[in-house]
UniProtKB/Swiss-Prot annotation:
This is Ankyrin repeat domain-containing protein 13A. It holds the Pfam family ANKRD13_C. GO terms for cellular component: cytoplasm; late endosome; perinuclear region of cytoplasm; plasma membrane. SUPFAM superfamilies: Ankyrin repeat. Residues 483-502, 519-538, 549-568, 574-590 form the UIM domain. ANK repeats lie at residues 40-69, 73-102. Signal peptide: none annotated. The keyword Nucleotide-binding does not apply. Keywords: ANK repeat, Cell membrane, Endosome, Membrane, Phosphoprotein, Repeat, Ubl conjugation.
Length: 590
């Protein structure tokens, strides 16, 4: 077995962190690799945070330790900071995380603008259709047509779906215009409804100089929210992903399926073995918070094929020499010896972990003759939009997989447990001005000729602001995508709660009977709310406690929905069997 001396030889910086000798650590870090990993897969910063050594963590953060690094189990530094239950640790890590993310976003803009500049000019429409297998839920699923113009280093993206409030989707006409020139960039958000433009032109290098750690101080309620909510880490497991051609026809005459999408023939693929893995940790919560979380658990999961594994704390392994962040009294000799088996022991607060795995299927329509390039033209724009849109972020993660040959003219991917997004590309280079797009639909036809595609030019008026619009300078507000995402989820949750309460108080129908439509709508709206809550890290305890009384009604509603779906699938199987029997009889008669 290795000794502490051996650990000092092989992992000297890690040993200083273990001892929380932060003064010596400060001296020794000069010229050293701050991202070195120990035998257990932890960087210096991960080790400091897991052990609750705030002083060492601050030293490492001053030396630019990567606050976004994941450990061997896929947890980030912020996840581990929340697990300690130390508000000061969470505050420090969160501040540096936000500073790092904002810095990286600004640093990535020049490269992104260069990619956009080098790509051929084009116009394309992306139709977003949100669908659900749950009956009645599909009634409130929205559609949107996203219109994109690209000319040189200029980009314009038009959307009409703005948000969700009071059980209805908020619509409006918005344009986001990006202009790049050398080290300058101009960002404009155009509100066509109010004729107001928020704009800012800035020097990227100066922005980096102005950006300071003090500007990224988190609010106290943000720290409190994280400490009173479960730590949730959702990831897409695609290591066993498989693209299979979808078949069409009857038994014995089945062929590879192909469909025409907006004038282009596309091969249809089913994407199998896509797993959404959700890890939930609750060891930092009080017993009351844990009970509240368990009471508000998602009743959809039993109906959606979710496989769940729970792992308890290491209470039976705790020794007299243990500390709060080393409950099983692991010694440095044991920890830094890669040949020593720690079994179920580990540093950090004993984990109370739940792992949920759900399989999803996605669909792809691939066209090898599509005039756009996914890598050169489309991905840079999706990268840009993913910085402020959770839906674009999910699409970006998916399209960066290794697809079959061609361009994905149509994609269907899961967004949440009961919601899918279907994205269709169309009307390529069919619109050179903003006025033309108003009357056009994504179901456009193929471009008339190859020359029309290759010589396409965007009218520069697309990127200009109408004279009648009011321009508001210096209105930019730096957003972090994960916080926008949580705010969006919370808004949906609150809207659904208000709607459910109003429908519950509405009483019986005018004819004295029960209002079935309102009751079912409330149940299915609640289903969406519960589904969305499990997909976000920002759960609101007060709102969650208000919803527990609906669980029984929702469970019954979802069981009825699942039964209806099962009966529908059974009818389809019976019809296909009858068709096959008729076909065989006709062959026999011949």
């Amino acid at each position: 077995m290795s000794s502490a001396c051996d650990a000092g030889d092989h992992y000297p910086l890690h040993l200083l962190v273990w001892k929380n000798d932060y003064r010596q650590l400060e001296k020794e870090l000069q010229g050293q690799n701050v991202e070195a990993v120990d035998p257990r897969g932890r960087t210096l910063l991960h080790l400091a945070v897991s052990l609750g050594h705030l002083e060492s963590a601050r030293v490492l953060l001053r030396h630019k330790a990567d606050v976004t690094k994941e450990n061997r189990q896929g947890w980030t530094v912020l996840h581990e900071a929340v697990s300690t239950g130390d508000p000061e640790m969470v505050y420090t890590v969160l501040q540096h995380r936000d500073y790092h993310n904002t810095s990286m976003a600004l640093e990535g803009v020049p490269e992104l603008l260069q990619k956009i500049l080098e790509a051929p000019d084009f116009y394309v429409q992306m139709k977003w259709e949100f669908t659900s297998w749950v009956p009645l839920v599909s009634r409130i699923c929205p559609n949107d047509v996203c219109r994109i113009w690209k000319s040189g280093a200029k980009l314009r993206v038009d959307i009409t779906l703005l948000g969700f409030e009071n059980m209805s989707w908020i619509r409006g006409r918005r344009s986001f215009i990006f202009k790049g020139e050398d080290n300058w960039a101009e960002l404009m958000e155009v509100n066509h409804d109010d004729k107001v433009v928020t704009t800012e032109r800035f020097d990227l290098s100066q922005e980096m100089e102005r950006l300071t750690l003090d500007l990224m101080k988190p609010k106290s309620r943000e720290v409190e929210r994280r400490l009173t909510s479960p730590v949730i880490n959702t990831s897409l497991d695609t290591k066993n992903i498989a693209f299979e051609r979808t078949k069409s026809g009857f038994w014995g005459w089945r062929t590879d399926k192909a469909e025409v999408v907006n004038g282009y023939e596309a091969k249809v693929y089913t994407v199998n073995n896509v797993n959404v893995i959700t890890k939930i940790r609750t060891e930092h919560l009080t017993e009351e918070e844990k009970k509240r979380y368990k009471a508000d658990r998602n009743p959809l999961e039993s109906l959606l094929g979710t496989v769940e594994h729970q792992f308890g704390a290491q209470g039976d392994l705790t020794t007299e020499c243990a500390t709060a962040n080393n409950p099983t009294a692991i010694t440095p000799d044991e920890y830094f010896n890669e040949e020593f088996d720690l079994k179920d022991r580990d540093i950090g607060r004993p984990k109370e972990l739940t792992i949920r795995t759900q399989k999803f299927k996605a669909m792809l329509w691939m066209c090898e003759e599509f005039p756009l390039s996914l890598v050169e033209q489309v991905i840079p724009i999706i990268d840009l939009m993913a910085r402020t849109s959770a839906h674009f972020a999910r699409l970006r993660d998916f399209i960066k997989l290794e697809f079959p040959p061609g361009f994905p003219v149509k994609i269907e991917i899961p967004l949440f447990h009961v919601l899918n997004a279907r994205i269709t590309f169309g009307n390529v280079n069919g619109c050179s001005t903003a006025e033309e797009s108003v009357s056009q639909n994504v179901e456009g036809t193929q471009a008339d000729s190859a020359s029309h595609i290759t010589n396409f030019e965007v009218d520069q008026s697309v990127f200009e602001i109408p004279e009648s619009y009011y321009v508001q300078d210096n209105g930019r507000n730096v957003h972090l995508q994960d916080e926008d995402y949580e705010i969006m989820q919370f808004a949906i949750q609150q809207s659904l709660l208000e709607s459910s309460r109003s429908q519950e108080l509405s009483g019986p129908a005018s004819n004295g009977g029960i209002s079935q439509t309102n009751t079912y709508d409330a149940q299915y709206e609640r289903a969406i709310q519960e589904s969305l809550l499990t997909s976000t890290e920002g759960l609101c305890p007060s709102a969650l406690s208000e919803t527990s009384r609906f669980d029984n009604d929702l469970q019954l509603a979802m069981e009825l929905s699942a039964k209806e779906l099962e009966e529908w699938e059974l009818r389809l199987q019976e019809e296909e069997a009858e068709l096959q029997q008729v076909l065989q009889l006709s062959l026999t008669d011949k």
